[in-house]
Protein backbone atom coordinates (compact mmCIF):
# COMPACT_ATOMS: atom_id res chain seq x y z
CA UNK A 1 0.00 0.00 0.00
CA UNK A 2 1.33 3.41 -1.01
CA UNK A 3 1.77 5.50 2.13
CA UNK A 4 2.68 8.65 0.22
CA UNK A 5 -0.19 11.07 -0.43
CA UNK A 6 -1.47 11.64 -3.93
CA UNK A 7 -0.77 15.20 -5.07
CA UNK A 8 -2.25 17.60 -7.60
CA UNK A 9 -0.12 20.30 -9.22
CA UNK A 10 -1.91 23.41 -10.49
CA UNK A 11 -0.47 25.13 -13.57
CA UNK A 12 -2.20 28.18 -15.02
CA UNK A 13 -1.12 29.33 -18.47
CA UNK A 14 -1.95 32.06 -20.97
CA UNK A 15 -0.28 32.48 -24.34
CA UNK A 16 3.22 31.15 -23.65
CA UNK A 17 3.62 27.47 -24.59
CA UNK A 18 7.39 27.80 -24.97
CA UNK A 19 7.86 28.24 -21.22
CA UNK A 20 4.95 25.96 -20.35
CA UNK A 21 6.77 23.10 -22.05
CA UNK A 22 9.65 23.56 -19.60
CA UNK A 23 7.24 23.62 -16.64
CA UNK A 24 5.60 20.39 -17.81
CA UNK A 25 9.02 18.81 -18.25
CA UNK A 26 9.85 19.85 -14.67
CA UNK A 27 6.80 17.88 -13.56
CA UNK A 28 7.62 14.82 -15.65
CA UNK A 29 11.13 14.70 -14.14
CA UNK A 30 9.84 14.57 -10.55
CA UNK A 31 11.23 11.65 -8.55
CA UNK A 32 8.20 11.43 -6.25
CA UNK A 33 7.02 7.82 -5.84
CA UNK A 34 3.41 8.65 -4.95
CA UNK A 35 0.54 9.34 -7.32
CA UNK A 36 0.65 12.73 -8.95
CA UNK A 37 -1.14 14.81 -11.55
CA UNK A 38 -0.52 18.10 -13.30
CA UNK A 39 -3.51 20.20 -14.27
CA UNK A 40 -2.75 22.73 -17.00
CA UNK A 41 -5.54 25.30 -17.26
CA UNK A 42 -5.31 27.40 -20.43
CA UNK A 43 -7.72 30.26 -21.08
CA UNK A 44 -6.02 31.86 -24.09
CA UNK A 45 -8.64 31.35 -26.79
CA UNK A 46 -6.10 31.68 -29.60
CA UNK A 47 -4.42 28.42 -28.64
CA UNK A 48 -5.65 24.88 -28.12
CA UNK A 49 -2.89 23.08 -26.24
CA UNK A 50 -2.50 19.34 -26.82
CA UNK A 51 -0.54 16.87 -24.72
CA UNK A 52 -1.39 13.24 -24.05
CA UNK A 53 0.05 11.83 -20.85
CA UNK A 54 -1.60 9.81 -18.06
CA UNK A 55 -0.40 12.21 -15.36
CA UNK A 56 -1.10 15.48 -17.20
CA UNK A 57 -4.53 16.99 -17.87
CA UNK A 58 -4.66 19.93 -20.26
CA UNK A 59 -7.90 21.90 -20.08
CA UNK A 60 -8.54 24.54 -22.74
CA UNK A 61 -11.17 27.21 -22.03
CA UNK A 62 -12.60 29.27 -24.91
CA UNK A 63 -13.08 32.35 -22.71
CA UNK A 64 -10.64 34.05 -20.38
CA UNK A 65 -11.29 34.00 -16.65
CA UNK A 66 -12.08 37.36 -15.09
CA UNK A 67 -9.18 37.18 -12.61
CA UNK A 68 -6.23 34.88 -12.03
CA UNK A 69 -7.52 34.27 -8.50
CA UNK A 70 -10.77 32.85 -9.84
CA UNK A 71 -8.82 30.82 -12.39
CA UNK A 72 -6.83 29.26 -9.53
CA UNK A 73 -10.04 28.36 -7.73
CA UNK A 74 -11.40 26.59 -10.81
CA UNK A 75 -8.17 24.63 -11.21
CA UNK A 76 -8.30 23.54 -7.57
CA UNK A 77 -11.91 22.45 -8.04
CA UNK A 78 -10.78 20.27 -10.96
CA UNK A 79 -7.96 18.67 -8.97
CA UNK A 80 -8.41 15.02 -8.04
CA UNK A 81 -6.34 15.10 -4.86
CA UNK A 82 -6.28 17.05 -1.60
CA UNK A 83 -2.60 18.01 -1.34
CA UNK A 84 -2.10 20.78 -3.86
CA UNK A 85 1.05 22.28 -5.33
CA UNK A 86 1.23 25.61 -7.14
CA UNK A 87 3.14 25.01 -10.40
CA UNK A 88 3.97 28.21 -12.28
CA UNK A 89 4.10 27.91 -16.06
CA UNK A 90 7.18 30.12 -16.54
CA UNK A 91 9.44 28.88 -13.73
CA UNK A 92 11.54 25.78 -13.13
CA UNK A 93 11.20 23.14 -10.43
CA UNK A 94 14.01 20.68 -9.86
CA UNK A 95 13.16 16.94 -9.77
CA UNK A 96 13.12 16.65 -5.98
CA UNK A 97 10.43 19.26 -5.38
CA UNK A 98 7.48 16.96 -4.73
CA UNK A 99 9.45 14.40 -2.75
CA UNK A 100 11.19 17.01 -0.59
CA UNK A 101 7.99 18.95 0.04
CA UNK A 102 6.00 15.89 1.09
CA UNK A 103 8.84 14.77 3.36
CA UNK A 104 8.70 18.12 5.18
CA UNK A 105 4.95 18.69 4.96
CA UNK A 106 3.07 18.50 8.26
CA UNK A 107 -0.57 17.46 7.65
CA UNK A 108 -1.62 19.15 10.89
CA UNK A 109 -0.14 22.43 9.71
CA UNK A 110 -1.45 21.94 6.18
CA UNK A 111 1.04 24.20 4.40
CA UNK A 112 4.65 24.00 3.26
CA UNK A 113 6.84 26.55 1.52
CA UNK A 114 10.60 27.15 1.59
CA UNK A 115 11.88 30.56 2.57
CA UNK A 116 14.29 30.88 -0.35
CA UNK A 117 14.69 30.17 -4.05
CA UNK A 118 17.15 30.64 -6.87
CA UNK A 119 16.76 33.58 -9.24
CA UNK A 120 17.55 33.07 -12.92
CA UNK A 121 17.94 36.34 -14.83
CA UNK A 122 19.19 36.43 -18.43
CA UNK A 123 20.74 33.00 -18.00
CA UNK A 124 22.66 33.90 -14.82
CA UNK A 125 21.80 32.17 -11.54
CA UNK A 126 21.68 34.24 -8.36
CA UNK A 127 20.81 33.66 -4.74
CA UNK A 128 19.56 32.14 -2.62
CA UNK A 129 16.98 34.91 -2.29
CA UNK A 130 13.92 35.36 -0.10
CA UNK A 131 10.53 36.62 -1.28
CA UNK A 132 6.87 35.58 -1.14
CA UNK A 133 7.48 32.75 -3.65
CA UNK A 134 3.95 31.41 -3.25
CA UNK A 135 4.43 29.36 -6.41
CA UNK A 136 6.85 27.18 -4.46
CA UNK A 137 4.17 26.21 -1.93
CA UNK A 138 1.86 23.30 -1.30
CA UNK A 139 -1.17 23.16 0.97
CA UNK A 140 -4.17 21.08 1.89
CA UNK A 141 -7.65 21.44 0.48
CA UNK A 142 -8.77 21.83 4.09
CA UNK A 143 -6.83 25.09 4.43
CA UNK A 144 -7.92 26.23 0.97
CA UNK A 145 -11.57 25.69 1.85
CA UNK A 146 -11.03 27.28 5.26
CA UNK A 147 -10.22 30.65 3.66
CA UNK A 148 -12.62 30.15 0.73
CA UNK A 149 -9.83 29.95 -1.78
CA UNK A 150 -8.14 32.78 -3.60
CA UNK A 151 -9.54 36.31 -3.86
CA UNK A 152 -10.91 37.56 -7.17
CA UNK A 153 -7.78 39.60 -7.87
CA UNK A 154 -4.89 39.88 -10.29
CA UNK A 155 -1.45 40.74 -8.94
CA UNK A 156 -1.47 40.12 -5.19
CA UNK A 157 -3.95 37.24 -5.20
CA UNK A 158 -1.23 34.96 -3.79
CA UNK A 159 -0.22 37.42 -1.06
CA UNK A 160 -3.82 37.81 0.09
CA UNK A 161 -4.28 34.03 0.12
CA UNK A 162 -1.29 33.55 2.42
CA UNK A 163 -2.37 36.44 4.64
CA UNK A 164 -5.78 34.80 5.01
CA UNK A 165 -4.12 31.50 5.90
CA UNK A 166 -1.96 33.20 8.54
CA UNK A 167 -5.04 34.82 10.08
CA UNK A 168 -7.35 31.80 9.95
CA UNK A 169 -4.68 29.22 10.79
CA UNK A 170 -2.01 31.00 12.88
CA UNK A 171 1.50 29.80 12.14
CA UNK A 172 0.49 27.78 9.09
CA UNK A 173 2.14 29.98 6.46
CA UNK A 174 5.53 30.27 8.16
CA UNK A 175 8.17 29.30 5.55
CA UNK A 176 10.69 26.51 5.99
CA UNK A 177 14.35 27.47 6.44
CA UNK A 178 15.74 25.59 3.47
CA UNK A 179 19.45 24.97 2.87
CA UNK A 180 20.95 26.04 -0.48
CA UNK A 181 21.57 22.47 -1.61
CA UNK A 182 17.90 21.64 -0.91
CA UNK A 183 16.36 24.48 -2.94
CA UNK A 184 14.11 23.19 -5.70
CA UNK A 185 12.52 26.36 -7.07
CA UNK A 186 14.11 28.53 -9.77
CA UNK A 187 12.32 31.84 -10.24
CA UNK A 188 12.90 33.16 -13.75
CA UNK A 189 12.89 36.88 -14.39
CA UNK A 190 14.48 38.17 -17.61
CA UNK A 191 15.33 36.01 -20.57
CA UNK A 192 12.15 34.03 -21.23
CA UNK A 193 10.69 36.42 -23.81
CA UNK A 194 7.43 36.36 -21.88
CA UNK A 195 5.60 38.53 -19.36
CA UNK A 196 5.40 38.78 -15.58
CA UNK A 197 2.05 39.90 -14.23
CA UNK A 198 3.88 41.51 -11.30
CA UNK A 199 5.77 43.82 -13.66
CA UNK A 200 2.55 45.69 -14.38
CA UNK A 201 2.10 47.10 -10.89
CA UNK A 202 1.56 46.27 -7.24
CA UNK A 203 -1.57 44.93 -5.61
CA UNK A 204 -4.47 47.37 -5.38
CA UNK A 205 -7.68 45.98 -3.87
CA UNK A 206 -10.38 45.44 -6.46
CA UNK A 207 -8.27 46.70 -9.37
CA UNK A 208 -7.38 43.31 -10.94
CA UNK A 209 -3.86 44.61 -11.57
CA UNK A 210 -2.06 43.08 -14.52
CA UNK A 211 -5.05 41.41 -16.17
CA UNK A 212 -5.53 43.79 -19.09
CA UNK A 213 -1.81 44.42 -19.48
CA UNK A 214 -1.08 40.72 -19.91
CA UNK A 215 -3.83 40.42 -22.52
CA UNK A 216 -2.45 43.42 -24.42
CA UNK A 217 1.09 42.00 -24.29
CA UNK A 218 -0.05 38.68 -25.73
CA UNK A 219 -2.26 40.30 -28.38
CA UNK A 220 0.58 42.49 -29.60
CA UNK A 221 3.00 39.57 -29.85
CA UNK A 222 0.37 37.49 -31.64
CA UNK A 223 -0.17 40.25 -34.22
CA UNK A 224 3.58 40.26 -34.89
CA UNK A 225 3.47 36.51 -35.45
CA UNK A 226 5.54 35.83 -32.33
CA UNK A 227 2.92 33.67 -30.60
CA UNK A 228 1.66 30.54 -32.31
CA UNK A 229 -2.08 30.22 -32.85
CA UNK A 230 -4.45 27.29 -33.25
CA UNK A 231 -3.81 23.72 -32.18
CA UNK A 232 -0.40 23.38 -30.52
CA UNK A 233 1.00 19.94 -29.69
CA UNK A 234 3.20 20.50 -26.66
CA UNK A 235 6.70 19.00 -26.61
CA UNK A 236 7.96 19.23 -23.02
CA UNK A 237 11.69 19.72 -22.63
CA UNK A 238 14.19 21.92 -20.82
CA UNK A 239 16.18 24.47 -22.80
CA UNK A 240 18.97 24.19 -20.22
CA UNK A 241 20.12 21.46 -17.84
CA UNK A 242 18.97 23.29 -14.73
CA UNK A 243 20.19 20.57 -12.38
CA UNK A 244 23.71 21.05 -13.70
CA UNK A 245 23.32 24.83 -13.63
CA UNK A 246 22.48 24.73 -9.91
CA UNK A 247 25.17 22.16 -9.14
CA UNK A 248 27.83 24.29 -10.84
CA UNK A 249 26.65 27.40 -9.01
CA UNK A 250 26.71 25.63 -5.65
CA UNK A 251 30.27 24.47 -6.33
CA UNK A 252 31.28 28.04 -7.13
CA UNK A 253 29.67 29.40 -3.97
CA UNK A 254 31.34 26.68 -1.88
CA UNK A 255 34.74 27.70 -3.24
Model-predicted regions and their roles:
Residues 5-8, 37, 160:
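Cell-envelope/extracellular polymer assembly enzymes that use nucleotide-activated donors
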Residues 22-35:
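Short, acidic, metal-binding catalytic loop of nucleotide-sugar glycosyltransferases
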Residues 40-50, 88, 92:
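A conserved acidic beta->alpha catalytic loop
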Residues 62-79:
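Glycine-rich, basic loop-to-helix element that forms the pyrophosphate-binding segment
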Residues 91-104:
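Acidic donor-binding/catalytic loop of UDP-sugar-dependent glycosyltransferases
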Residues 112-126:
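Short beta-strand-to-loop element that shapes/binds the nucleotide-sugar donor at the catalytic cleft/hinge
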Residues 153-155, 159-255:
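C-terminal catalytic/acceptor-binding lobe
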Amino acid sequence: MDSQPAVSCICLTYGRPQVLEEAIHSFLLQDYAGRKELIVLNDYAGQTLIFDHPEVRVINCPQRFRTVGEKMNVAVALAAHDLLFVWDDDDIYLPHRLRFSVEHYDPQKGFFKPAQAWLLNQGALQGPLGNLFHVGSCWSRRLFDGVRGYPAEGTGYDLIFEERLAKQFPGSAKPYAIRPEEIYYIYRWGGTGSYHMSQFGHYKPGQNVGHNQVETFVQQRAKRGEIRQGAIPLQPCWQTDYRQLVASYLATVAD
